[in-house]
Amino acid sequence: MNIRVEKDCSNVDWNRLRAVLKEAGMGYHDADIHKKAFENSYSKVFIYDDNELIGLGRAISDGVYQAAIYDIAVLPSYQGYGIGKIIINNILESIPQCNAILYASPGKEDFYNKFNFRKMKTGMAYFQNAEKMYERGFIEKFIVLNNENR
């Protein structure tokens, strides 16, 4: 492997990024949506083997005391080689004074525990499609409320 880390969006093939997310079993959108999300993020990390994108991640942050980490993905054929560790460490180094909330895929908790991430007792999320997130294991339960309950 010839691993290279990039921290800007200038060389990203957004269709390839979409494919990496899909192959890693993550949520994915049109390439233009990912481009906008990464370009507007505080921190981003892209991992290449030679010129092939194999892993990625990003954080949104105020850069002072709060951050949220999203889209940590490594191609399955590269998992277990420390690529995810490189991504997480680079992101955490970019937000050294910040508390960070992580949006992780179900079943990946043990990996993130190695970096001192812990489950929150008070964390909550609003999803555009709560039923889908329930089916994918992201939330424990959901109750459909109409707009009058807000």
Predicted ranges, named:
Residues H29, I33-A73:
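A conserved beta-strand-loop-helix scaffold within acyl/acetyltransferase catalytic domains
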Residues E93-P106:
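Conserved GNAT acetyl-CoA-binding A-motif
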Residues I101-Y103, N113, R118-F138:
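Conserved catalytic-core motifs of GNAT/GCN5-like acyltransferases
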Residues M1-D32, G123, E135-R150:
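Short amphipathic alpha-helix that is part of the acyltransferase structural core
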